[in-house]
């Protein structure tokens, strides 16, 4: 199917330079626009050794002006969701009238961002220029919550869309991509300005499952203990306590919710900041999450729920 503004496809196999060249050329041919303004790529972890070469193949043969993305344990191509599979997904966009600029940032910069002028000064992008941002962040080597707070202060009122990279848990390794560069820490942000704006749509919501708990031992984004018990055991017990139909719905759809306001007497859907469950290790009992929770924080596991969509 040929379209004017966007096209997306899934490459299901391992790295194959000749095959990827032909595939990228065919995908580019499906986009009727005279140029590709932006490409977004998401690769499964088996592409780690070939990431730089893959980026070069895609940039050249799909004729992409600006390419960004990250590694991902799960992939989405159009209406297709691909879990626990190898390959990559590439989306091509024609954005007439858009101005685009990509920047890479690090944890060191997050720690240095003491005032709202730091990021415009560092990136060279003034707050009045973008209409919004796309961002992809490594969850293991950067405090994403500190970053987004300082970013929001610098670029107040501008939407930020994107997500956290993932890999093969428990290995704390992910990749972030910008044009031909591969980063294993920090994040990448794409400023989108000009005649193109960003609008968000929430496709699915989350429903709390089980009971609320207190985090009793946390190390960065690793949760060791919940209620003085191994975190993985609490997750397994929560899952096993669900009715069979709820267990079926929860497979591959579990998240963690961190309470926003600890002063509430009861917690319901909407009271949680929902973050990814990146992985878990039954031997050590550790859960890795896409956030930096704190010891003493209240949490509740969440199930992705199409009926809770808004």
Indicate residue ranges for each PLM-predicted region.
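Small-residue-enriched flexible segments
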Residues: 1-52, 57-60, 65, 70-74, ...
């Amino acid at each position: 199917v040929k379209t004017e503004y966007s096209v997306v496809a899934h490459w299901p196999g391992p790295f194959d330079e000749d095959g990827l060249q032909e595939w990228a050329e065919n995908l580019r041919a499906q986009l009727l626009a005279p140029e590709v303004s932006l490409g977004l790529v998401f690769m499964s972890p088996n592409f780690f050794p070939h990431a730089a070469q893959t980026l070069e193949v895609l940039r050249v043969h799909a004729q992409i002006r600006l390419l960004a993305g990250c590694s991902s344990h799960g992939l989405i191509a159009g209406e297709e969701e691909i879990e626990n599979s190898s390959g990559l997904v590439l989306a091509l966009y024609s954005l007439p009238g858009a101005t685009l600029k990509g920047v890479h940032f690090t944890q060191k910069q997050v720690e240095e961002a003491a005032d709202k002028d730091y990021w415009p000064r560092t990136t060279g992008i003034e707050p009045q220029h973008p209409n919004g941002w796309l961002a992809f962040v490594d969850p293991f080597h950067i405090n994403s919550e500190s970053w987004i707070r300082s970013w929001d202060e610098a670029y107040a009122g501008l939407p930020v869309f994107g997500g956290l990279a993932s890999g093969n848990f428990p290995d704390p390794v992910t990749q972030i991509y910008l044009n031909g560069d591969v980063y294993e820490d920090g994040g990448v942000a794409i400023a989108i300005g000009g005649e193109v704006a960003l609008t968000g749509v929430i496709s699915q919501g989350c429903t709390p499952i089980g009971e609320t708990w207190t985090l009793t031992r946390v190390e960065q984004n690793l949760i060791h203990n919940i209620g003085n018990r191994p975190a993985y055991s609490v997750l397994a017990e929560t899952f096993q306590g669900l009715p069979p139909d709820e267990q079926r719905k929860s497979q591959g759809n579990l998240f963690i919710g961190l309470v926003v306001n600890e002063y509430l007497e009861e917690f319901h859907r909407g009271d949680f900041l929902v973050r990814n469950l990146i992985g878990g290790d039954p031997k050590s009992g550790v859960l890795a999450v896409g956030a930096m929770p704190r010891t003493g924080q209240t949490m509740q596991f969440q199930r992705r729920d199409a009926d809770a969509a808004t």
